[in-house]
Design a protein with these regions (language model features):
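Short, well-formed alpha-helical segments that are part of the catalytic scaffolds
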Residues: 11-32
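Short beta-strand-to-loop acidic/aromatic patch adjacent to the donor-nucleotide binding site
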Residues: 87-98
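Conserved donor NDP-sugar-binding/catalytic core segment of glycosyltransferases
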Residues: 97-131
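A conserved acidic beta->alpha catalytic loop
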Residues: 21, 40-52, 97-98
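Glycine-rich, basic loop-to-helix element that forms the pyrophosphate-binding segment
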Residues: 64-85
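Active-site donor/metal-binding and catalytic loop motifs
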Residues: 177-179, 184-202, 213-214
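Non-catalytic, C-terminal membrane-associated alpha-helical segments of glycosyltransferases
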Residues: 224-288, 292-293
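A short, conserved alpha-helix in the catalytic core of glycosyltransferases
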Residues: 143-146, 150-155, 160-188
Length: 389
């Protein structure tokens, strides 16, 4: 059976819509005809306590766990602790996200035992794009299936993070424990995210502090300082774009106060290359180079961890030309410059639509999971489920 977990706070209308969507899902594997699974709602101290029916239209049982304070993402921990022990997997959602179908559940049952989590392909219908964030082996919390026992063994999310980058911390601990994170392109989740009323200063403050914590905890000793600088540069640029300089400054001050308190459990270089996506960029670009060598490229649609793509190209002795607006010669190919799955998929689909088969312009994605999507109904998981040396 399966357990769906979603935290909520002061959004009863949105919660009701999500429960309705979950109740419309068909085809849950059943432990008994009357018991297809459960939904655990964690009410993070709503002003008016959240309510829900005891069962949804498809028979999913529903329980509401009320918390006295807003525990942020760590409220998911109490839900997993209360999940039905028959559930091998727990599906993490938000109160505004839900799977489009149940086909992913059958594939979860065939996942290799060292796959601890399976990331979904998360769509934002209201914004006509996919969810940003994450990496090939870092999931996004509003659309991921996690082995219940692994989550419990690793003590779940660190409450100190509250929200933002807590998934990076948990994914790092999974990798250190010998597990992998996979990506299932047919595990589709809709996230009805609302951009309004978001305090970007608060968001930037947490992003700066929490991502700094992650690198302080897990980056190899000879890369730690550079990785913290990389995070600082990225979020300074975002703060300028989002007019959230105050939040950036507050986050930086908080990071400086707390960074020495973070326990160091550094990864080996090999594990860290998986964590950052460098292993996957190397694999994809080396494969493309072997198929048809190239000497010059331009980076397009640049985003998170673009530095690993530049490094993988440098290792191939490939020259990166300036932006397409430059009057320089046409590059041999265009390379998508983000390691975040959602933006990478969006860019690849958009660019290949503009440059159909037979076009002289070659488009490369820095992750083979993007270009080797298994057939519908396949049991194959991609991304982190492929071992990379």
């Amino acid at each position: 059976m399966i357990t769906y977990i979603l935290p909520t706070r002061d959004r009863p209308e949105r919660l009701a819509l999500t429960l309705g969507a979950l109740g419309n899902l068909k085809g849950h594997p059943v432990s008994s005809p009357q018991d297809p699974g459960e939904v655990l709602i964690v009410d993070n101290a709503s002003k008016f306590p959240a309510t829900a029916p005891e069962k949804l239209a498809n028979g999913l049982r529903v329980r509401v766990l009320h918390r006295a304070t807003n525990e942020g993402a760590a409220s998911r921990n109490i839900a997993v602790q209360n999940a039905d022990p028959r559930s091998e997997w727990v599906v993490m959602l938000d109160d505004d996200s839900y799977p489009c179908d149940t086909g992913f559940i059958r594939r979860l049952g065939k996942a290799p035992q060292d796959v601890a989590a399976v990331s979904a392909d998360i769509y934002l219908p209201g914004m006509s794009r996919r969810e940003s964030g994450g990496l090939p082996e870092v999931f996004i919390g509003c659309g991921v299936a996690i082995r219940r026992q692994v989550f419990l063994d690793l003590n779940g999310y660190d409450p100190a993070f509250n929200y933002y980058a807590e998934e990076y911390d948990l994914a790092a601990r999974m990798i250190l424990a010998g597990y992998r994170i996979a990506f299932d392109p047919w595990f589709r989740v809709e996230h009805h995210k609302v951009a309004a009323n978001r305090d970007m200063n608060t968001i930037l403050a947490r992003l700066v502090r929490n991502n700094g914590w992650v690198m302080q905890r897990y980056a190899p000793a000879d890369m730690r300082r550079a990785q913290i600088r990389e995070q600082r540069t990225r979020y300074r640029q975002i703060s300028q774009k989002e007019n959230a300089r105050r939040g950036f400054t507050e986050g930086l001050l908080e990071l400086r106060k707390t960074i020495r308190a973070q326990k160091r459990t550094p990864m080996s270089r090999q594990l860290f290359d998986r964590f950052t996506g460098l292993s996957y960029a190397r694999e994809a670009l080396q494969s493309a180079y072997t198929t048809k060598p190239f000497r010059t490229v331009q980076l397009i649609d640049e985003g998170k961890n673009g530095w690993v793509i530049r490094k993988a190209l440098a290792e191939l002795n490939v020259t990166i030309l300036p932006t397409p607006h430059s009057p320089l010669p046409t590059p041999d190919c265009l390379v998508i410059g983000s390691m975040s799955p959602g933006p990478m998929l969006d860019a690849f689909e958009r660019r290949t639509l503009l440059n159909p088969a037979g076009s002289p312009q070659r488009i490369l994605a820095p992750w083979t999971a993007i270009t080797r999507k298994p057939a519908a109904g396949s049991d194959i998981l991609t991304g982190g489920a492929t071992k990379v040396a």
